[in-house]
Amino acid sequence: MWVGVISLFPEMFRSVTDFGVTGQAVKKGLLSIETWNPRDFTHDKHRTVDDRPYGGGPGMLMMVQPLRDAIHTAKAASPGKTKVIYLSPQGRKLDQKGVEELATNENLLLICGRYEGVDERIIQSEVDEEWSIGDFVMTGGEIPAMTLIDSVSRFVPGVLGDFASAEEDSFANGLLDCPHYTRPEVLDDKEVPAVLMSGNHKDIRQWRLKQSLGRTWLRRPELLENLALTDEQEQLLAEFISEHNAK
């Protein structure tokens, strides 16, 4: 996967390219990340990238010419058809379904806004989709862009050591993840559930599914409203609720 990024602070993306799973993916050639700084496309000695908004009001907007030139240069450098995304509080909220949709694209170009945003005409003429990571405002689009890159790259074949890890993550099947345990068997008088050490794969699978359903019911019940549960899932959820209410 190729990801281009338009940002006034391209150095921030070293946390993606140099570390963790995404850093390993870059080293293996599975993920390519390139950045363009609108300041490099300015024509004045001050390298100005912001301008006053028409109609007045607080704050500044990103200047049109440097931003548009950066976008055009980045698109020309892309290895193929590219989806252009603007990270914006007004965009579609990113969730697991959206992540999987975006992961079907081989090339993405992410535009990171700053100040009060960008000229609406840039969005209309250059942007394919707007995406948000939540109903809150940040100082820029860099962290949302890194969030998107991290989540989407998990679905690039070979990025995760075990691709099933992505398929079994929270939200991958519409549910929250089940609890996980490692050594020691006893920690502060709390024991690992016996079923996980039983070696019975069927029982382990059912326990994990039951805990996943129960955790979703407890913490994010609205997620269950959009799911068509199987007979097995309904039975396991009913058992979890009964056991929970009996405590």
Curated annotation (Swiss-Prot):
Is Cytoplasm found in the keyword set? Answer: yes
Instruction: Classify the main location.
Output: cytoplasm
Q: Which domain of life is it from?
A: Bacteria
Localization of this protein: Cytoplasm
Looking at the UniProt record for this protein, which Gene Ontology cellular component terms does it annotate, in alphabetical order? cytosol
Which SUPFAM superfamilies does the record cross-reference, listed alphabetically?
A: alpha/beta knot (SSF75217)
Q: What Gene Ontology molecular-function terms does this entry list? A: tRNA (guanine(37)-N1)-methyltransferase activity
Which keywords has UniProt assigned to this entry? Answer: Cytoplasm, Methyltransferase, S-adenosyl-L-methionine, Transferase, tRNA processing
Keyword Transferase: yes or no? yes
InterPro entries registered for this protein in UniProt: Alpha/beta_knot_MTases, tRNA_m1G_MeTrfase_C_sf, tRNA_m1G_MeTrfase_TrmD, tRNA_m1G_MTases_N, tRNA_MeTrfase_TRMD/TRM10
Reactions listed under catalytic activity: guanosine(37) in tRNA + S-adenosyl-L-methionine = N(1)-methylguanosine(37) in tRNA + S-adenosyl-L-homocysteine + H(+)
Q: Which parts of the sequence bind S-adenosyl-L-methionine?
A: G113, I133, G134, D135, F136, V137, M138
| Documented EC number(s) | 2.1.1.228
How it assembles, according to the record, is: Homodimer.
Family, as annotated: Belongs to the RNA methyltransferase TrmD family.
PANTHER family for this protein: TRNA (GUANINE-N(1)-)-METHYLTRANSFERASE (PTHR46417:SF1)
Which NCBIfam families does the record cross-reference, listed alphabetically? PRK00026.1, trmD
Name of this chain's protein: tRNA (guanine-N(1)-)-methyltransferase
Organism this protein belongs to: Vibrio campbellii (strain ATCC BAA-1116)
**What gene is this protein a product of?**
trmD
